Amino acid sequence: MSDTPRAPAPIPLASKPRPVASGRPGSGKTACIRTFGCQMNVHDSDRMRRMILDAGYAEVNTYEDADVVILNTCYVRENAVDRVRGHLGELNRLKREGRVKKVALTGCIGAAKESNTLRSRFGIDLVLGTHNTYELAEFVGLPTMEETYTPDLRGTEGEHAAFVTIMTGCNYRCSYCIVPTVRGRMVCRSKESVISEVDRLISSGTKYVTLLGQTVDAWRYEGDRFCDLLEAVADRAPRVSFTTSHPSNMEDRTLRAIGEKDTVVKRLHLPVQSGSDRMLRVMHRGYKAERYRRKIGVFREAAPDGTLSTDIIVGHPGETQEDHEATLRLVEDCAFDSAYVFKFSPRAGTEAAALGEVVTPGLAQRRFVEILRAVEGNAFARNRRKIGGTEDVYVRHGANDEGRAIGETWSGHAVHLRTDAAPGEYVRVGIESAGPHVLYAGNTPEVESEAKLG
């Protein structure tokens, strides 16, 4: 087995099958949803899930058992598109055999020109982009075709947790990124609308709210800024986090709120992409490395125990060894707890795809490994400090067949623990060991009530 380290993915490329949900009894109709890509897509899939349930479909986990299959897709990197092509090939075969009746392609691929080719090649019945998913209502037989159709949402991890989208799109034009093309320019929801949704979710039992946006900290509405919204949500919700942020929008007040607000998870995901000022200019990121370092200093002061993660691209066209070494220095200076390290993937329609000075695959791989090893070294050292301590852990995913659950500390650390506690409960555990990406608890945690922990 190779000892080459691998970068952890932010979420699985294709979603894991969810527990089967039921539509109206007696309909006999079945549907399967597969989600590729970011948390925004996970949230969009929840909206579509409510549509199919409202239309009387029962959700199933396999294509073979489904009358209708919906692929909610990602277009950020070519390997994501390759995976979708593979799924479409399988679905095309099942349609020819009469085992699947209809296939819908939604999400970012649906908003790209390539969707026309995929539609004709694989016999896709419906293609939707990121701004017209409401049209799925008619596709599944709902008696409404109104753009305002907004199904009642449930938490995306069950009743205990929910994503709340506060804005869509992006106004930045990073050299490598296709998101503004397929998601459009930034559109922000009103503060009143967001708060109303949060209040409704909490009243229905949601305990953990995650605010979502392509550049979530860019949210602005009628004089309010993201820090105003975050503080308002934190005053209502028992537990709050947010993703994903852009350094150019990140205000000191927001960083301090992470540390000061008891209900905000002390975690910051702030993509830097490169530690080289020259490459940051080429990428059109809008900040310098020193400005990024200063923001991290504010965060570390506000939340000394908090977790910090980032995104880094290696092998962007024109990246030199000097640029790479500047990124390594920034990694050491910031001591990230984790990083999503990506080798540059050219996307048609982006500025970077047309640039020369291509970094060879072999060199990009070496730089990838060096960055990842530096990140993991820092992360492992920071996690080891937790060994022997006690943590209050929020259970995110209940125990598997082996009795092991996955939870999260208030500092944002992932924890593996043995417990019968249900998702949404808190458990007090001792940390016995650690890896670079996870803490491991003892075998006899004590379930604590939320009131007692508060």
Task: Identify the meaning behind each predicted range.
Residues 101-105, 112-114, 203-322, 332:
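Conserved SAM/AdoMet-binding glycine-rich loop
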